[in-house]
């Protein structure tokens, strides 16, 4: 079986909800990192690109009808290059990379572009059609995040806890304190601030040209969700709106954000033929299901499964990128895997609590960050893992070349 490699990747800055990227359509946003990679590697024979695979969780607005294909065309890829959109909710971007890797390993492709995009700012309101004549009970949903058009049987059998409520469930089950969650959130902010100061995050980012009033254009180049100056006192003073006497706050949870990322995935032979450098081998990937009300613990079985497939242990990992949907679930995962709360190799440059969590993009961001960090610290293996709404987890192991 052939190996698949990450050759390079870029991402946009992550925008706040209603922030700098809210003026950019989702399909245009997805085109930005694709176009940047094409500009970086003008020698690429674009006709040899087998597919563009993007993750996107919403797909109810401008990201509808296969946003990967739309973004590929808008980026200037030939019409002969196909595109498909993956939806595994929060894990979509990482899953897209996995699909690309499997295509190469199976001999169904040699050169692919994979990543993800999400504009939560531009998520629309949706309304279902009437199911009977003269029906006047139309439901309207904000598609930014969470459940919509719920099947009554799903609600009866599994519940429909909101994402913050699932984090409260994990905290209650594993006795994770508010103080520990706020301390974790502060570390995320501090590590992100240091990575910004040291130019580490800038190495991943390509600018987005944002249209303004009267034809003006602004270049957006810096993640805008981090709060570098926040203190533990401020975090501990935030309200817990999701449950009475709860522990989950806006400060120890990830944000609602906008962004896009893309990576070049290739076989070794094709990479060398196209003037690319294989940087990181995609070793293995796994997914797993858990109880939906405890969705935040999904990375635990997914990680155990991918480690078993790779013949490795958690102690072999030099870098771990664990998506910080909530401090409660991130701490739950770390403790279940036998890792300390403040492990230096876990999210060394911060995570989603500080950077934000554009759902379809986040997994691709994790893979890009892990690949780059392996090379920075001369490590060998990295783990990327995420929880997923409705009770799933996804995990991928990378190896530095």
Give the label of every model feature segment:
Residues 24, 56-112, 144-147, 157-163, ...:
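Conserved catalytic cysteine-centered active-site region
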Residues 111-169:
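Flexible glycine-/small-residue-enriched beta->alpha junction loops
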């Amino acid at each position: 079986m052939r190996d698949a490699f990450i050759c390079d990747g870029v991402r946009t800055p992550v925008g706040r909800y209603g922030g700098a990227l809210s003026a950019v359509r989702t399909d245009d946003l997805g085109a930005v990192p694709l176009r940047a990679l094409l500009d970086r590697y003008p020698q690429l024979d674009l006709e040899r690109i087998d597919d563009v695979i993007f993750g996107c969780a919403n797909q109810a607005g401008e990201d509808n009808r296969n946003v990967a294909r739309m973004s590929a065309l808008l980026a200037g890829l030939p019409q002969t290059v196909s595109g498909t959109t993956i939806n595994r909710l929060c894990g979509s971007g990482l899953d897209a990379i996995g699909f690309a890797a499997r295509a190469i390993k199976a001999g169904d492709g040699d050169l692919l572009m994979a990543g993800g995009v999400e504009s939560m700012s531009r998520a629309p309101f949706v309304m279902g059609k009437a199911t009977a004549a003269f029906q006047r009970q139309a439901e309207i949903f904000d598609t930014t995040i969470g459940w919509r058009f719920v099947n009554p049987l799903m609600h009866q059998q599994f519940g429909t806890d909101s994402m913050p409520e699932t984090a409260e469930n994990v905290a209650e089950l594993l006795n994770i304190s508010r103080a520990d969650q706020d301390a974790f959130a502060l570390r995320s902010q501090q590590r992100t601030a240091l990575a910004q100061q040291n130019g580490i995050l800038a190495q991943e980012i390509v600018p987005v040209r944002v249209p303004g009033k009267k034809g003006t254009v602004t270049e957006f180049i810096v993640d805008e969700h981090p709060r570098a100056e926040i203190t533990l006192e401020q975090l501990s003073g935030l309200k817990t709106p999701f449950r009475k006497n709860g522990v989950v706050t806006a400060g120890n949870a990830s944000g609602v954000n906008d962004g896009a990322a893309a990576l070049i995935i290739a076989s070794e032979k094709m990479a060398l033929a196209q003037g690319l450098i294989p940087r990181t081998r995609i070793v293995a990937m796994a997914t797993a299901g858990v109880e939906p009300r405890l969705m935040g613990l999904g990375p635990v079985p997914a990680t155990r499964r991918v480690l078993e497939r790779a013949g490795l242990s958690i102690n072999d990992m030099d870098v771990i990128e664990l998506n910080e949907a909530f401090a409660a679930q991130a701490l739950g995962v770390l403790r279940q895997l036998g890792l300390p709360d403040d492990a230096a190799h876990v999210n060394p440059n911060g995570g989603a609590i500080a950077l934000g969590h554009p759902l379809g993009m986040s997994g691709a961001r994790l893979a890009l960050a892990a690949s780059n960090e392996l090379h920075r610290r001369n490590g060998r293996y990295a783990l990327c893992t995420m929880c997923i709404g409705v009770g799933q987890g996804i995990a991928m192991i990378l190896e530095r070349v």
